[in-house]
Each structure stands twice: as C-alpha cells, then as structure tokens.
Design a protein with these regions (language model features):
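Conserved alphaE helix
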Residues: 106-117
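ATP-binding glycine-rich loop module of kinase domains
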Residues: 13-54
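Conserved structural core of kinase catalytic domains
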Residues: 69-108
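Juxta-kinase regulatory segment immediately upstream of eukaryotic protein kinase catalytic domains
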Residues: 1-13
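C-lobe/activation-segment region of protein kinase-like
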Residues: 120-124, 135-177
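Hydrophobic residue at the +6 position relative to the catalytic HRD Asp in the kinase catalytic loop
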Residues: 127-132
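Protein kinase-like catalytic core scaffold
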Residues: 35, 70, 84, 140-142
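The N-lobe alphaC helix and its flanking beta3-alphaC-beta4 segment of protein kinase-like domains
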Residues: 49-67
Length: 177
C-alpha cells in the first residue's frame, strides 16, 4: 500500500478522492482514523491564475472559518512537501446526489444561508458540486478555495447550473466519465 507523509508522520493512501485546480486529494489513514491529504500540484490551469497555492489554501481556510463556513478542520500543513492534512467528512457529494436526483430543498436552503455569510464579506467559493459533502444532514464545503465576490461566479449565476441535471452538468459528466 502506498504511503505519504505529513511532517514526517506516515499515512496509508486508501484512494484518490479527486483532483482539483490546486491539487490531488487522497483518503488516507494512520491506522486509527481517516483523513484527507491534499498534495498541491503545479499543473497548468488555463482558466485560473494562482500565486503560492499552499499559502492561498491556508489564508482562505482562515477567512472561511472566520465567516463560519461549515468545513473540515485543517489539522496540519507540511510546507516543505506542500501538503495539507484535513479532517475527513464522510458522506455523499452534491455531485453524487445530482446523479441520483437526490438533491433536496434543504441542501439549497443551506447553500442560501452560506451565501448570506459569503456575499456581504465580498467572498465567493467554488460552488461546483464535487466541493460539497452532506454528512449528518449538514452541507460541508470541503475545499478551502475562495475568491473576491463576482456576480458572474456566484451560486445563483454559475454554481446552480451544476446542482441539478442541467445541460451544463450533463455535458461535464459526459466529458469526465
């Protein structure tokens, strides 16, 4: 089994959870508990410009925590290896729930509440449905990325297009099977 370290502590890699603009997220275990280990990558992204990705993640995490965004706790950062260890929140992603046609009004209500915290703070997050996990009835934002608010990228203008089986969602799904 493959292992990865964070600040010299070893974790067994269970599986790849996903790849985003900034890194790869793995489900890992120390033998007692499961975590998410995010490895920052430096692959080009033609639609997004980054500075220091790790520092951005750490800064964004603090900003979103201050706003009360439900998220996994940041447990550790390994600056040398550009890795972040996060709390693992088990549950289905909104993406999976869209596929099953199980997104509920309560999920949308929780997103509206979240937007009421974000927008007055001049903040957008990445509303793509793979970035949200439902656990114990709570909607968690499992990414730490945030950006200055722009209406073109807010939930009502952009994000909602991927929270049901819209043409945009179906096109994305067809391209990523």
């Amino acid at each position: 089994m493959e292992t990865m370290t964070v600040n010299d502590r070893e974790y067994q890699v269970r599986r790849l959870l996903g790849k985003g603009k900034g890194g790869y997220s793995y489900l890992v275990s120390d033998g007692k508990q499961e975590y998410v280990l995010k490895q920052i990558h430096h692959e080009p992204c033609d639609y997004y410009q980054f500075g220091d990705k790790l520092q951005s993640e750490l800064r964004d995490y603090q900003h979103l925590m201050n706003l009360g965004v439900p998220m996994p706790r940041l447990l550790e950062a390994d600056l040398r290896q550009e890795r972040i260890l996060k709390e693992y929140i088990p549950g289905d992603t909104i993406y999976t729930l869209v596929q099953r046609e199980q997104v509920t009004e309560d999920h949308f209500r929780q997103m509206e509440e979240l937007c009421r915290r974000l927008y007055p703070a001049d903040t957008n997050i990445d509303y793509f449905p793979t970035n949200f996990v439902v656990s114990g009835g709570v909607l968690y934002y499992v990414d730490y990325e945030c950006n200055p608010y722009q209406q073109a990228w807010d939930f009502e203008t952009w994000g909602i297009r991927y929270w049901s089986k819209t043409p945009e969602f179906l096109e994305y799904e067809a391209l990523h099977r």
